[in-house]
Amino acid sequence: MYCDKGASSLANGLLPNVSGDITAKDNILDALDSSAEEHFWGRYIDGFEGQIFPQIPVSVHEAHLTGRARYEIILGNSMVTTLYTVSSIIRTGWALLVSQYTESQDVVIVSSLELPSQAMGGTILFPIRFRIRQDGRTEELLQSAKKHADKVLSSQKHDFPHTKDFVDPFSNSILLICTESQPSHSLEELLTELSASKKCALVLRCELLEDKISISAMFDPQVVRPRQTRRILDQLGHILKQISGSDMLVGDLDFLSPEDRQEIGRWNSRSALSDECIHALISKQAQQNPAAMAVNAHDGNFTYGELESYATRLAAHLIHIGVKPGNFVPTLFEKSKWTQVGILAILKAGAAFVMLDPSHPPARNQLICRKANACFALASAPCEPVLSMAVPHVITLSHSFMEELGRLQPPHEQKSPCLDPRAVAYLLFTSGSTGQPKGAILEHRSFAAASRGVVAMTHMSSTTRTLQHSSYSFGAAIVEIIATLVAGGCVVVLSDTERLSNVAASMVAYSVNWAFMTPSFARTVNPADVPCLRVLATGGEGVTSDIVETWASFVSLYTVYGSAEQSSIAAMAGPLATHQRGNSANVGSPFAGCYAWIVQPDRPEKLAPVGCVGELVLEGALVARGYIDEVESTAAAFPKGFSWRCLFPLHQEGSTRFYRTGDLVRYAVDGTLEFVARRNGYIKLRGQRIELGEIESQLKAVARQPYEFCVEVVVPKGETADKAVLVAFVALGSAYTDNEICESAISSPEQFDQGILVDVLGHVEERLAETLPAFMIPRFFFPLQHFPVTSSGKIARKILREQAAQMSVLQLAELSLGSVEKKELQSDMERYLRSVWVQLLGVPEDFIGANDSFFRVGGDSLKAIKLFQRLRRDGYNLNVTSIVAAPTLSQMARNCSLLD
């Protein structure tokens, strides 16, 4: 791109020497002719690994430079400003800032260059490529930028007409540098051309005046908000002052401007929380409204007075039999009214609860009990045998047991211990990278603060009727129960059949008006079918625009952010309106008692500039103490502190705690948080948090041979992101019949010995089901000869994901074990069910055998619900619980019956 006479012959550039050394490459232009120019620019851009800044949203079809902002900076005299031109300093400073916004060390910027009037004259645009190393020096970058511009100026004799084609891909932002001597008409014509192109969203016009630099920004407010543009100018000025002052390591640069620091401090200046115990807040509601309904369950109801009485009675019994403050007491119940009594009694006894899910493998629940060093536990009668294998004393909770306690127990024989709000309230286990679950330790004040935040944000009250839908092993279940009781509302407990099979009708029957759902589950519910619902909180996975469009006009819709280590819920945003569908990634601000910091992803000792993506670090009372008996994991995730913290004299209650979330976020213009992605091995799939390393460890433990496994989340070809699946890649080596296969290529079934594969892995799913919950078991197994590796010798996970994503669900299933040795159908019921599977899953009939699992051939938990609904319409009864427990076609045929 050019302006003024002869400019088309001069729009060219060189790849800057990224190491700072000047080599023979600098003379390449002298040897180029017109025919070689296109090839040169192709090689110049080849291998670019960065991103373009700014990213233009899909919704913005044309950029319009209607916004304006100004900034001035005075550069002092120094050795740097003497040796290098101000133009080189500006270009280098802009590249450094762009590297922060794009999270990349590979940066291409487009800048202008004024040609000498005695030559061709005019102003040209040319690309400059920087490779920025943290251990490199700023003077090396300055030297490279200056040498590159000098070479462009010295190559005026060449005519390179294709340069514009290589400028355009990087022209979302343009850096214009002009001097007082530059002809104004040249620059104005260039600005007119940029505006007319409707491709550029940000133009920085830097005027080099006698004693200062004046920067004028032209921008598209749809792409870069006015406030953020001002921040960009502040940040650029802050960088320019540093690199113009003296030579320094890139890693020592401070990218956080003084203005950024002030704003971050202001956003974190929230009032401190008041320390409280969870059970004390609930007891207060019982005292004020003893006749109000606290629990409305399929197996019975409790008023607040009854809940308080039963919990106090059970707490006294727990103390009497030896439960001490600080003990961990597991609970294992089907969905029941007694769960609420159990956890409240444990808290009143001074102990901490550990909620378990009976649908998880017994071995996993027993492992958690052992990790919690549990001596006492509460369970329902059907669940008691599971816990008795790991816990010495298991109390079977029931109405008759509680009535017996009332007869035997003298009133007020045992008093609940007076608890410090900093005492442990519960232990919540999540997936762990070591192959075993790890438990986050949460205090009373932590979850009391989180509950207060939810209550205030969503206007919970005594009229709230909350659906207790989430698994007991999921932090959302604790929110559903405790936040509701803190607000004086009613916890609605459905049976597993009601919850999994016909949740909408059940919500109406129980008059549910508040619910938490993952986006995946929310897609299975029609808002018109739940007219009683007033508030929907959604989280656990990315909230996409379709959720906002579907629900925002029917309910008050909120997005939720949190994890086990952050009291399960640390921030909320909403209520969202339908026009905010493009802002669905915003998760709001942390609740009182929690500060939000964003650090550079690979350099947590430095804060990220406002607007740049970084790792979220949370600080304060909402943060867990750490992981039980996991010293290394605790040290990695819960650092003691950061040097930058002293820059912010914010309120702190005693010793503070930090948690590195592993989530990549950015500050929005108003200081709220926008979720971007995960940065480590943790993923969330349909609301469930999963550590891929735990699955890989379990696969190695149960496989018959010491093969290598790699588990990844893959979005199959033709599917949307919410249809992602877990795929276990396995390196079989000698199991292949074709030893010449490319190691990074996806194999076909003919390329390996399926008999060996079945012999090695045929029992894996069954063994995994003994230790992992269903949502952690891979849907497909993907055979390879060897894993592709990166230059550093690590498994090239990206290659695995990309190549598997080129295959449809059907192709993945064919490649996996599900296609081996299909059994013929034997009954009319099997044939009927196969026809339903075909319609629901979109697979051919001959793809389904009697021994095929619904989940292996394309089903998932949400499609299981649709299967139940379809069968019910046809007059058959097969609930979701049965589908999950017995998923093969033949098993379903045996369990399916006619409706009464």
Curated annotation (Swiss-Prot):
GO terms for cellular component: cytoplasm. SUPFAM superfamilies: Acetyl-CoA synthetase-like, ACP-like, CoA-dependent acyltransferases. It is an enzyme of class 6 (ligase). It holds the Pfam family AMP-binding. GO terms for biological process: amino acid activation for nonribosomal peptide biosynthetic process; secondary metabolite biosynthetic process. Induction: Expression is up-regulated more than 10 fold in toxin producing cultures. Pathway: Mycotoxin biosynthesis. Residues 284-686 are annotated as: Adenylation. PANTHER family: FATTY ACID SYNTHASE (PTHR45527:SF1), NONRIBOSOMAL PEPTIDE SYNTHETASE (PTHR45527). This is Nonribosomal peptide synthetase AMT10. It comes from Alternaria alternata.
